[in-house]
């Protein structure tokens, strides 16, 4: 099977409906659909129970009903310990060569998204398209990196769009599953490890895949999530972007602009190396 689409949900019935209906509306059905619900109490579980045996309403269908009997569908509703625990559950039961994480509230832009993207799933480890986002009342297309030739320095910027990223399932076997000790940055850590430090390949395709609803934990603006984001950024800096790894970063970025600039100015390179040694000693 070429593709598995994984949706996680917790108490977001309205968002879940949008996501599910956008998936069931696809003209191409060469995928399995996995929904992981965290034992919701807002009616999500009952809604998921209903679509196991019934039709689901869909505005794009002329008779306002969409048959779901031909879909390979898995639904799990049970308590979990967080976003990345739920995502990992979905990954472990998936069978597709590629995985798309389309969480509740995010939805595919039209009924031909999967038909258009399937030919692009060519063996590249991670294939990323665009999302449509709305922030501060403005709607725009987010192209992430907007290029295929990314390097370690690019990876540090964290422009990954999981709603538009098709990852080979074998990457999780090779580099590990999402780190469940993170509440916000677990997917960022995964991409750093397989693209920044590992040898995974990446391709950008200029196709818009999904609407990103926003308002998730990574966008959280209350005091708790602001503090959590700061803590995880500090942890990332220490564990993934430590100055001790700077020489390795440069090695991974040999084709990047920073490497070229430093080597054109030998004094800048010498200063950078000296500062690296000093900071390494301070950190010990």
Where are these regions (language model features)?
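Short loop->beta transition adjacent to catalytic acidic/histidine clusters or analogous donor-positioning motifs
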Residues: 1-4, 24-35, 43, 72-74
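Conserved nucleotide-sugar donor-binding catalytic segment
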Residues: 144-229
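C-terminal subregions of glycosyltransferases and related glycan-biosynthesis enzymes
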Residues: 189-190, 196-284
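Glycine-rich, basic loop-to-helix element that forms the pyrophosphate-binding segment
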Residues: 19, 76-94
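Short aromatic/hydrophobic "clamp" motif used to bind/position activated sugar donors
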Residues: 99
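A conserved acidic beta->alpha catalytic loop
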Residues: 22, 29, 37-47, 103, ...
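Conserved donor NDP-sugar-binding/catalytic core segment of glycosyltransferases
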Residues: 107, 111-141
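N-proximal low-complexity "stem/linker" segments adjacent to membrane-targeting elements
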Residues: 1-25
